[in-house]
Each structure stands twice: as structure tokens, then as C-alpha cells.
UniProtKB/Swiss-Prot annotation:
The record marks 92 as: Stabilizes the basic form of H active site to accept a proton. It comes from Acholeplasma laidlawii (strain PG-8A). This is Peptidyl-tRNA hydrolase. It catalyses: an N-acyl-L-alpha-aminoacyl-tRNA + H2O = an N-acyl-L-amino acid + a tRNA + H(+). The active site is at 19 (proton acceptor). Hydrolyzes ribosome-free peptidyl-tRNAs (with 1 or more amino acids incorporated), which drop off the ribosome during protein synthesis, or as a result of ribosome stalling. Catalyzes the release of premature peptidyl moieties from peptidyl-tRNA molecules trapped in stalled 50S ribosomal subunits, and thus maintains levels of free tRNAs and 50S ribosomes. GO terms for molecular function: peptidyl-tRNA hydrolase activity; tRNA binding.
Length: 191
């Protein structure tokens, strides 16, 4: 069984913000799969259990704020007895150019507080992550930038990237070969 978690902040005020790119990716995946999330306050997540290419998959969004994302990830992992190496976290990255992705099997939190909390709560950094570039914040406070909404032009760049992310997720689940996914999808994509 796999666990795919998109990071973001709950609440209408955060819809379409840069920090919520993980939620945006999950919404697109759910639309593709024609399924919806259900809220489970005990697990601190909105999630669904579905099948992709015959594999059981949990797709989730934490109900907590970004900085406490580890609570939901840990609870889902323990409840469904999911191995840490079968977890994929989708998140924003200000160090990547807008619309570029980076897929890794392990690594640091890179200053991303949601990822930092997951690493702390799981007690390991050895889980998969898919970072989506939201660009730099050179002329803005970082917090204001990540909590700011995408412009129309930025959305036009991001939406094809989300399709690319879905392709990577589906291929990972169908092949169970993450090394090939990293090789194929980490190369610069033309959108």
C-alpha cells in the first residue's frame, strides 16, 4: 500500500496559494481518478483509499496547518500499516524555478517546515518527496510570498506541471520503480 500526501494549509484563504501546491496536485489527481476525500478528524486528514493500477493507495491532505503535517502522515501510516518507503509527500519549493519538479527518495527538509515536521514525527528522512517549484521570492518576504496566490500567468505555468506530476505518480505506482521515475521525471520537462 502507498500513501500520497499533498502538503498545504486548510481553509478558503489558502486556496490557490503557492504554499498549497501539494493540495492542488492532490485535487488534480483526485479529479483524474474520479474520487473524493473524506474527513477523518482522528487521523487529522481528509483522505481516500483507492486503487491505482491494482495497487491500494491512500491519497491525503492533512487537516492541520503545514507546520504540523507530520501528525496526519504518522497517523495514516500507523493506521494503515504503511512502510515509510511507500510514502510520497508532494510540496512546494522556493529554490526550484516555477513549474519545475524534483523527485527524491530521501533528503533534508530544505527549510520547508511541513517537511521538517514530517521528518521529526517519523524519525526518519527516508521517504519519497516530490517538490514542485514555486519560484523565488526575491522582492518579497518569504512568508508573504508562499502564502500569496498564484497569478494567472503562474497558474498557466503550474497547471501543465501538475499533469506531469500525475503522470509520475501513476507511473511510480504501476511500475513500483522509483529510480526510473527519478531518472525520467527529474530531467528538465518541456511544458
Amino acid at each position: 500500500m502507498k500513501l500520497i500526501v499533498g502538503l498545504g494549509n486548510p481553509g478558503k484563504q489558502y486556496v490557490q496559494t503557492r504554499h498549497n501546491i501539494g493540495f492542488i496536485a492532490i485535487d488534480k489527481l483526485l479529479s483524474y481518478l474520479n474520487t473524493e476525500l473524506k474527513v477523518d478528524s482522528k487521523l487529522q486528514a481528509a483522505y481516500t483509499k483507492t486503487k491505482i493500477e491494482g495497487e491500494d493507495v491512500i491519497i491525503a491532505k492533512p487537516l492541520t496547518y503545514m507546520n504540523l503535517s507530520g501528525d496526519a502522515v504518522t497517523k495514516l501510516m500507523n493506521f494503515y500499516k504503511i512502510d515509510v518507503e511507500d510514502i510520497l509527500v508532494i510540496l512546494d519549493d522556493t529554490a526550484l524555478p516555477l513549474g519545475k519538479i524534483r523527485i527524491r527518495q530521501t533528503g533534508s527538509h530544505g527549510g520547508q517546515n511541513g517537511l521538517k515536521d514530517i521528518i521529526n514525527k517519523l524519525g526518519t528522512k527516508d521517504f519519497k518527496r516530490l517538490r514542485i517549484g514555486i519560484g523565488e521570492h526575491a522582492h518579497m518576504d518569504k512568508v508573504d510570498y508562499v502564502l500569496g496566490k498564484f497569478s494567472t500567468n503562474e497558474l498557466n505555468t503550474i497547471l501543465p506541471t501538475i499533469e506531469y506530476v500525475n503522470d509520475a505518480i501513476i507511473e511510480w505506482i504501476s511500475t513500483n520503480n522509483f529510480n526510473n521515475i527519478m531518472t525520467k521525471y527529474n530531467t528538465p520537462q518541456t511544458l
